[in-house]
C-alpha cells in the first residue's frame, strides 16, 4: 500500500496552504468522517479500491505541482538602460501643459530666457543643521548623581528624547506664481556689486558755541570747517586718551599738587575742594573779573606761566594777548597774520570766571603755536592743534583736557520779553539795541517789555526803553491793505489827437519828413479842425 499522504507531507518542505489545496482537490468527492458525530455515514472501506488508488495518484501529482520541494529564488529582470536625452528647460516643462499652439508661441516670445539650455539649473538651498543645545541636568537627576558611588553608575535609565515631527508647509498657487516671477527677475537682472555700508557721522549737540579761528591770508570756507569739525570729533571718540580720561566735571580735586604754578592754575577751578593758592583767592570771587585791573592781571599771570612752561618756542614779539569786548558769543579767537605773528583775543562777556579765562587762553595759544611755530595754515583743530593740547595735559596733569568747543552759558544784561501772557518769547542782549517801537513779537505780534538783569539780587528789573515811541497797534499779516488810488495819466496833447495822428501819420512820413516835423504838422491840423 502506498505511503499515507500526511507522512509524505511531513517529510517535504511544503507549506500548510499547499497541503490543504492538494487534499481538497484529491478528496473533494469524499466526505470527512467525524468520530464524535452520531450521524450514520458511509464508511471508506465500502468504496472500491480502484477509486482509492486513483485519488492517491492524483494527490501525488498535485503535490509535485505545488512545489513540495524547496522554493527557488525569485527571478529579477535586469534594469533597463534608458537613453537619456538633453535636459529639459523650464520652458519645455511648461509647454507640456499648454495645448494651443498660439499660446506656446507667445510663451516663447515673451520669455526666451526660459528656453535657454546653457543656463544653470536652480540649486536647492543647503539645509543648515542646527546644533542641539544640551540642557543641564534636572533636579532629580542631580539627586541621583549625588547618591551614585564613586566608581559606579546610576541604575536609573535615561529617558529617550522624542524627536519632533517636521512641519509640512503647503504652498498655495499664488505663492508658486510669486516664486516663479521672482525667478524670472533674477534671470533678467544683471549682477550688481553689494552696497557699501554708509559711514555714520557722529553729531554732538552738547556744544553751544564754537570758537573762532581767523587768518588774514584767506578766510576758511564753511564747508571746510564742517569737515574739520567732523574729523576732529571722530578723532576724539577713537582716541585712547579720551577713553581713559575721567570727566573733569564729575570729579573734585582734593589733593594739592606739589608744583606751585600748577597749584595756582588748579585753584582757579570752581570744583576744586582742596587748599586754594593765596594768589588765586582774588580771582575766584564772583565779582572779581568785572573789574578791568583784575582781568588784566589774571591774563598777564596766565600768559607768563603758559608761555614759559609750554609755549616757550613762541617768541614774545610774535605773540599778543588782549581783551576784545566786541566778542559776544565766542569765548576767544586767534588771528594769524601773514608776517608770522599771532594775536589772541579774549571775550570779557563770555569769560566771566577765572576757570573760563584759563581754559580759553590755553585753547587759543595752541592755535597760535600751530601758526607761529609749526607754520601750519588752515590747521584748525587738526593733528597739529591736538599735539599742543596733549603737551599741555602732559605738563599740567591735574588740569582738565583741552576741549575743542565750549558750552558756557552767556550772561545777558538786558532782556526783551513779550507782553502777552501766553507767549514765552524772550530776546537776550548785551545792550539796549532793539527798537521796541518798530519791532514786535514774531509769534503773536505783541509788544516787547525791556528788563535789566541785577547782579546783586539776581533778578530782573523792568526799565523804560528810551527808544520806545507811542505808536498805534500793530496790524497782523492777516489784514489786507487798502488798494491804491487809481493813477491819473496826464497827456500833453488834447483829447482825440492820438487817434487822429495814427490815421494821418503815414501820409507825411512817405514824404521823407522827420518824426518831430510830422507830429508838429499833425498837431497844427488837429487844432484847426477843433476850432472849426
Swiss-Prot record:
One term under GO cellular component: PML body
Location(s) in or outside the cell: Chromosome
Biological process according to GO: meiotic chromosome segregation; protein-DNA covalent cross-linking repair
Domain SprT-like: 308-398
Keyword list, A-Z: Chromosome
Pfam families for the chain: SprT-like (PF10263)
Biased composition (Low complexity): 14-32
Effect of loss of the gene: Mutant worms become hypersensitive to formaldehyde-induced DNA damage. Mutant worms exhibit significant reduction in brood size at 25 degrees Celsius and also exhibit a high incidence of male progeny at both 20 and 25 degrees Celsius. Moreover, exhibit a mortal germline (MRT) phenotype characterized by transgenerational loss of fecundity and vitality, marked by reduced lifespan, decreased mobility, and loss of fertility in later generations. Mutants have a mortal germline, where brood sizes become progressively smaller and the population fails to survive beyond 12 generations.
Domain of life: Eukaryota
Biased composition (Basic and acidic residues): 1-10, 39-48, 94-107, 124-133, 236-251
InterPro entries in the cross-refs: SprT-like_domain (IPR006640)
Tissues and organs where the protein is expressed, per its UniProt entry: Mainly expressed in germ cells and early embryonic, proliferating cells.
Molecular function terms from GO: SUMO polymer binding
Residues covered by region (Disordered): 1-50, 84-181, 213-253, 468-489
Sequence ranges of Acidic residues compositional bias: 213-235
Described function: May play a role in DNA-protein cross-links (DPCs) clearance through a SUMO-dependent recruitment to sites of DPCs, ensuring the genomic stability by protecting germ cells and early embryos from various sources of damage. May resolve the topoisomerase II (top-2) DPCs. Limits replication stress and DNA double-strand breaks.
Self-association state and partner proteins as the record states: Interacts with top-2; this interaction allows the resolution of topoisomerase II (top-2) DNA-protein cross-links.
Family (UniProt): Belongs to the serine-aspartate repeat-containing protein (SDr) family.
Record protein name field: Germ cell nuclear acidic-1 protein
Protein species of origin: Caenorhabditis elegans
Phylogenetic classification of the source organism: Eukaryota, Metazoa, Ecdysozoa, Nematoda, Chromadorea
